Amino acid sequence: MGREQDLILAVKNGDVTGVQKLVAKVKATKTKLLGSTKRLNVNYQDADGFSALHHAALGGSLELIALLLEAQATVDIKDSNGMRPLHYAAWQGRLEPVRLLLRASAAVNAASLDGQIPLHLAAQYGHYEVSEMLLQHQSNPCLVNKAKKTPLDLACEFGRLKVAQLLLNSHLCVALLEGEAKDPCDPNYTTPLHLAAKNGHREVIRQLLRAGIEINRQTKTGTALHEAALYGKTEVVRLLLEGGVDVNIRNTYNQTALDIVNQFTTSQASREIKQLLREASGILKVRALKDFWNLHDPTALNVRAGDVITVLEQHPDGRWKGHIHESQRGTDRIGYFPPGIVEVVSKRVGIPAARLPSAPTPLRPGFSRTPQPPAEEPPHPLTYSQLPRVGLSPDSPAGDRNSVGSEGSVGSIRSAGSGQSSEGTNGHGPGLLIENAQPLPSAGEDQVLPGLHPPSLADNLSHRPLANCRSGEQIFTQDVRPEQLLEGKDAQAIHNWLSEFQLEGYTAHFLQAGYDVPTISRMTPEDLTAIGVTKPGHRKKIASEIAQLSIAEWLPSYIPTDLLEWLCALGLPQYHKQLVSSGYDSMGLVADLTWEELQEIGVNKLGHQKKLMLGVKRLAELRRGLLQGEALSEGGRRLAKGPELMAIEGLENGEGPATAGPRLLTFQGSELSPELQAAMAGGGPEPLPLPPARSPSQESIGARSRGSGHSQEQPAPQPSGGDPSPPQERNLPEGTERPPKLCSSLPGQGPPPYVFMYPQGSPSSPAPGPPPGAPWAFSYLAGPPATPPDPPRPKRRSHSLSRPGPTEGDAEGEAEGPVGSTLGSYATLTRRPGRSALVRTSPSVTPTPARGTPRSQSFALRARRKGPPPPPPKRLSSVSGPSPEPPPLDESPGPKEGATGPRRRTLSEPAGPSEPPGPPAPAGPASDTEEEEPGPEGTPPSRGSSGEGLPFAEEGNLTIKQRPKPAGPPPRETPVPPGLDFNLTESDTVKRRPKCREREPLQTALLAFGVASATPGPAAPLPSPTPGESPPASSLPQPEPSSLPAQGVPTPLAPSPAMQPPVPPCPGPGLESSAASRWNGETEPPAAPAALLKVPGAGTAPKPVSVACTQLAFSGPKLAPRLGPRPVPPPRPESTGTVGPGQAQQRLEQTSSSLAAALRAAEKSIGTKEQEGTPSASTKHILDDISTMFDALADQLDAMLD
């Protein structure tokens, strides 16, 4: 074997001459027929399995390789490691030897014992040309070696950038990135990104990210971020964070990247990585200051003092959701804990740590699904280089319980239109709540847009935070026009915005497509795809960031008269010539543009197309609103004089019934809640949709929840506006914005009241009423006999939305007077107890004609006028009366059941002691709160149960109490213009005292047939029921509006206290008071219908008949001390002096005559209805009740005279 060893030695030494001699001898022996027995073995292998060709390939000598191949050397001979000559040639990276071996048909995909092919070696050592040649000869880059690594893995692991780019540009790039040849369950499974991150190859990582590799792909060790953090690759960590890696992902050891850094590294690089990870994740670390546990709450997080808690999110009730990881036990605990027991350990940059406990801090939406709170920032001018985000201010007046909600938290709040509204702690407005499963609302609730609100309201809101955005970010105000954003600063703004989430590479996509900042805020995922954002991860990230933008409304809120003006408002005046040349030279034609027509015209940029179509859509909305406004104004002239009430019942589960038809809009353009949808969809004109003050991505929950009751805490009584002020300054629901004017007011009228919906009125003529000048009165109508009330059901919220009818077209010759000083807006928040399933399916309550009239639990308020008194009101069986009624919105029989249910007291009816009336106060807006007025010279209550005037009630008025007090719904009158009525619904938010059983027939008779004295004047306080009395229950139906007097000047109708005879205390007031205190609202006392009747007296002014001991008085919370003093009415001439027996007897006779007249009127009404063939069930038992009433009345009058 000497010659073989000589050959190997010659090849190793590169002795080409010696190799040629040895090879020549081999050739010579082949030509002989009888050759030597000792032939030269060219494929001889040494102890390591190396052949001469192995050595030649390893040495890279082309001549030697060629000589050996000519001598018939085996090209794919393997050594002891399974390596072939091509492996060594590729390892050396010499191109020509590889080409020579490949031409000799060397196997390109032959694997060694460790599973490597020549491409593995070339890629590992970065031989670009060799790798390229191997790929050209069909080398498979997806083959894995025994370590489960592909050539791309090796190139990325060792930082071979060019080879990695070569492999990524191959046709098998997707397979390489997806790792199709690998088993994810393999413990050795890895990805090119992990290998590059482990070794800190930033450029390779950048190439992988550009190629679209999944950045959050996990292995046993976690994500690539785990690898970079573990090995201290700070720049790689920063690069991965810029690429959008999820920092909250845990590996199989339940560790995040931050956990790994904290546990295993202590270098300077680790400190930088910690800061980067904390900033990127938005993790809020807190340390427990004391132990906390709650065994009664399974969702509570039990903590010990010193525990480090990771805050995940915040519950709407103010608690924080935290996570405690116990590394020693390897367990995790998640639950809720109060923020007051912890201190901040780590926080995001810019968040004041001192404020976090008082204003709970949610986390970044991209990771924890909760909005990022703002940081305090110094005031600086508005810049366009940063886009605003949605956030919630820690300065929210609602405090730390209601200021921030969690989009993904457990027990998230219900729909804003039908859910709970949180009451602010300082009385300025409700807290901002975030609605679950909705786009993050804008903090634009605090933005006051010019021209849309009265100056006073704008001034009122000016002190509140402008917008809630993160540090260094500003809100674009309404004054920013699109053309201003296009003046060179828009590109910078878009670039900075995209840089915040490391996608600045798409800046050119937005700019080339013609998108500016306002239009980006309206982009959809489809629009992103159209401009070239094709990667799903990037598209999802940008779409989520767009949803968080807070851009003020920029579309024109009016219909321009000129096309150029409209284009300038959109910031696209350059298309004026193209539109005109294409025939779109007027606003009417532009309103019909479509996407296809824009392309035909020459508007090729997608952003410009988007903006033009948004403008066209706005024009269509404005036109539709104008048409609805015209229809509304025409229908308003035919409205019946009587007020119409629409009660919207909210279902207990927060979901309203599905409504057919188009979605209705509020004044701000946001969708109404399901309850309002259901209530308004039944009929009548739709509300006028005005231009929204905010973009759809900024719809405020507060704007859609205004007017909703069902507050979480006991509401405080709203103070009364005692001082005269403009009507538009009346008490609105807290935190609401003023709606813009719908249309010009009717002649002689002030601004329209603040209402949500204008129910359609009747086109017919109004019903005949009493002669002009007749005083206006309350009329409580009797219904069917009171039945034992049902136990209280779960409370449900109702909204009383009413609109007074206009005075135009009245057939009674009413004189229109100035309204601006007397007409005020009214909005009341009430609750109704749950009704039957029928009520749940049809929450709309509106007047309907004839017997099927559903009646709402409210009473109409009308101003009283001077003049001759009206005849006694007739017994009414329906709200409609003789006048035709407008078409009903809903024919549901549900409200009938509610008509016999218990009455509720309105939230805006705090109580006070009863006091005498006086002349009308100066005209001013009526407050939502009803209150009492002190009588002249401290006279006792005019109709109280005793002459002392309930001292305990006056003592209760010295302090302001938030808790409800037993009270009843006293009637109240408000000065309103001619033909305008308001409806006050009553609520069950205040418990009532049980009725005095002995006097129940008396009160029934008095209130039903008008013998009770009149209520005080418009400026006078309301009478209050005594503790032993109870207000009438809801068995009485709605009074007929048209039957009440409609004209005259308000005048005091109740006599002075001097006319009252000495009144003994009512039976058992103390007993009833104690009983009332024990009564828990389990059952409601029986109801008593009532009607207040005015009869003529001896003087020129009407002198109502009064019966003692029938006054409805109640004690309520003290009204707000800010109310100014009210005028003290002077005593009337005919009511001065003492009351003698003769006067008492005269009053008794007058009372008897009035009762007889009322009885005759009732009998006549019954007879008329029976003749018409439409007897009402509510009148069947009237005559039976009257005899009992008279007996009780006679006993009471005798006791009173004694």
UniProtKB/Swiss-Prot annotation:
SUPFAM superfamilies: Ankyrin repeat, SAM/Pointed domain, SH3-domain. GO terms for cellular component: cytoplasm. Residues 731-740, 1161-1172 have a biased composition (Basic and acidic residues). Signal peptide: none annotated. Residues 940-949, 1031-1051 have a biased composition (Low complexity). Its main location: cytoplasm. Residues 489-552, 558-622 form the SAM domain. Residues 355-460, 676-1104, 1116-1181 are annotated as: Disordered. The keyword Repeat applies. Residues 765-774, 913-923, 966-978, 1018-1030, 1052-1068, 1124-1133 have a biased composition (Pro residues). It holds the Pfam family Caskin1-CID. Gene3D superfamilies: Ankyrin repeat-containing domain, SH3 Domains, Transcription Factor, Ets-1. CDD domains: SAM_caskin1_2_repeat1, SAM_caskin1_2_repeat2, SH3_Caskin2. It is found in: Cytoplasm. Keywords: ANK repeat, Cytoplasm, Phosphoprotein, Repeat, SH3 domain. Residues 281-347 form the SH3 domain. ANK repeats lie at residues 48-77, 81-110, 114-143, 147-176, 188-217, 220-249. The modification Phosphoserine is found at residues 358, 393, 396, 403, 406, 409, 471, 725, 858, 877-878, 892. It comes from the Eukaryota. Residues 415-425, 1135-1151 have a biased composition (Polar residues). InterPro entries: ANKS1/Caskin, Ankyrin_rpt, Ankyrin_rpt-contain_sf, Caskin1-CID, Caskin1/2_SAM_1, Caskin1/2_SAM_2, Caskin2_SH3, Caskin_C. The modification Phosphotyrosine is found at residue 253. The keyword Disulfide bond does not apply. May not bind CASK. This is Caskin-2. The gene is CASKIN2.
